[in-house]
Amino acid sequence: MGKVLGIDLGTTNSAMAVFEGNEGKIIANKEGRNTTPSVVAFTDKGEILVGDPAKRQAITNPQKTIYSIKRIMGLMMSEDKAKEAQKRLPYKVVDRNGACAVEIADKVYTPQEISAKILMKLKEDAEAYLGEEVSEAVITVPAYFNDAQRKATKEAGTIAGLNVLRIINEPTSAALAYGLDKKHAEKIVVYDLGGGTFDVTVLETGDNVVEVLATGGDAFLGGDDFDNRIIDWAAKEFEAENGIDLKKDVMALQRLKDAAENAKKELSSANETEINLPFITADATGPKHLVKKISRAKFESLIDDLIEQTIQKIDFVIKDAGLAKSDIAEVVMVGGSTRIPKVQQRVKDFIGKELNKSVNPDEVVALGAAIQGGVLKGDVKDVLLLDVTPLSLGIETLGGVMTKIIDRGTTIPVKKSQVFSTAEDNQPAVTIQVLQGERELARDNKSLGMFELSGIPAAPRGVPQIEVTFDIDANGILTVSAKDKATGKSQEIKITGSSGLSDSEIEKMVKDAELHKEEDSKRKSMIEAKNQADSLLYQTEKSLGEFKDQLEESERTKIESAINDLKETLKKENLTKEEIDEKVKALTEVSHKLAEAMYKKENPQAADAQQGNTANAGKKKDDDVIDAEVE
């Protein structure tokens, strides 16, 4: 039975782990790092780069480099956060069936497709590490993600070729990784501040149970926003001095973004750092340089209101759980942004407890997801996760009112029903508008979907009985059904969130992903073949220059001819790997005499001995053959 991959699909970085040897174990990517930048880039040559290679070229290719895609997962273009994303992101955020998507070189990609490319990279690197195929995963999401965002995350996994066994909340996952389920019963706060999202969750843990009591947060608050405060400050200072707005220059903005992120990280350990960007722009007077010192105190003043927003959320969630700060036994810090000293100090001062920072905040969520994978596979016994729905769910009723069917904080999975009736005499159909949120009026809440139950027999208003059922599975994904109790007619909608993707579109994307996988594999093989050919040419030409006097002219001519053949082949436009391999093989074969000449010069006695032993060389048994490479 294959291993389940635990994935923390982050805004800034992603991480993966498996359950091995009775514990979660982080898997490094092919670059040897425990985290992979959640960045995807499209090059002018048609290549798709993911992770570190994509991040490295972002400065020179800002409009085709996608980062922070998690910020627009499941987001509608009509939402304020979409408008904010359009202002902040250097790539084009466009409308696709009402949902946010990105446009690269006249092609539109959904956030699910971009996220799938990150997941594919993680999947491939995990398979290389484990030496076996990985087809199942547990993926984490912020506790405050709504239905649309959860569904979009699951769709991304499907497109990447993963069977997503479970979507679980990041704080719950962190609690598992910290082993808090093994302690005596106590109430804890998980404070999770990542690159783009913030969650705070109160859990009751102990006796192998992790139960969510209350959760809150902001799906659009994190380290990216801290970076943006530095960017805004530096750009404003630069404009005041030079009269040039750097935010209108996408390449300058990308350089400033990288510098701001580095400055933020450095200020976690230093009291002051410098943003130094030579030749950031130019005008009629010549090139301009951005050189600014920023102190930790200045940085803290820039982000103080953002930190206070997180403190207010802690207060709200503790009260929502019916608790006081004195009831909290432990505070667990999760997410890279919790490394900021001011964040740690404010949380510690507010709750009045020392912070638990015993696990790497960048890795803890993926570790917990791997443990949950072990639970689902039966490798981990007696652990029970009791997650809750973060927002109330209901339908629109007469007068545009939101009538709640499942209240916020209800433990999932859950199934609840309510009976409704018609608003008019002889009403033949009812429209069910599914809503998520805490406001009293339907228009102030998020619409998750709409469907119609028709064929209701003629009857006075208030007589027909329409049973509406809300069913939330363990992933937090919702199915809503409506049934006319008189006729037994029913209609249901599996809420696809506002992802804007139909099942057929997801299926097409899965096939496209497989298709690109083959293309990518061919492209990679071609690059490797070219590299091998270049290396062989270099070594052969170098050796020929050194040892040509020890070769007969006919042998030298053969080698030179094979070198030229390979060089000409590499210049061809529509080159195949087979053509390269053929010419490489030819050059390798004619170069044998050159190798003999080299060996003879270096070790003449051994060469003579070798000549004498040639007759016996073919008599070695297969068992004696050692296949190895020497560096």
Swiss-Prot record:
Protein known as: Chaperone protein DnaK
Pfam families in the cross-refs: HSP70
Residue segments, region Disordered: 600-631
Modified residues (Phosphothreonine): T197
Taxonomy, superkingdom: Bacteria
Induction statement: By stress conditions e.g. heat shock.
Keywords: ATP-binding, Chaperone, Nucleotide-binding, Phosphoprotein, Stress response
